[in-house]
Amino acid sequence: MPELKSEYLFTITATVAQLHDVGAVPGGTRHVDLIGAGKFEGPRLKGELLPGGMDMKTLRADGSMVPNVRLVLRTDDGALIFMHYTGVRHGSPAVMARIAAGEVVSPTEYYLRNTPYFETAAPRYDWLNRIVAVGVGRRMPDHAAYDVFEIL
């Protein structure tokens, strides 16, 4: 059977500065989270999240959450990178309730994956424009973190 190969890119962490509960919409319940402070670091790039990012996530009737995130990253050498992703988080109702209550829950108890894409005009990071990546996430009471991998 063929094997899917990947290479670690970076770990990204972000806080939520403000949450807007839009309410019940046709696809579920819409929340718009304004992203606060954050950073990313890996072997080929590191830096910070710029203010103004947001997650326009949907909480679906089946209990899963679908993120819809837009961020601008600034590398430590000043390059700007637009990052956008969607994905899915799901787990048992009891585990999701613990996360919602702010409890620290092991990421082995739920599924949190995303598919980031990147856009940049910076020549040094141009390779990001042509890759597929996958993020494996965990939700902490005060931030979210994702380990991001390039699919080779």
Feature-to-residue mapping (PLM):
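Beta-strand-enriched cores of mature, soluble protein domains
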Residues: 1-152
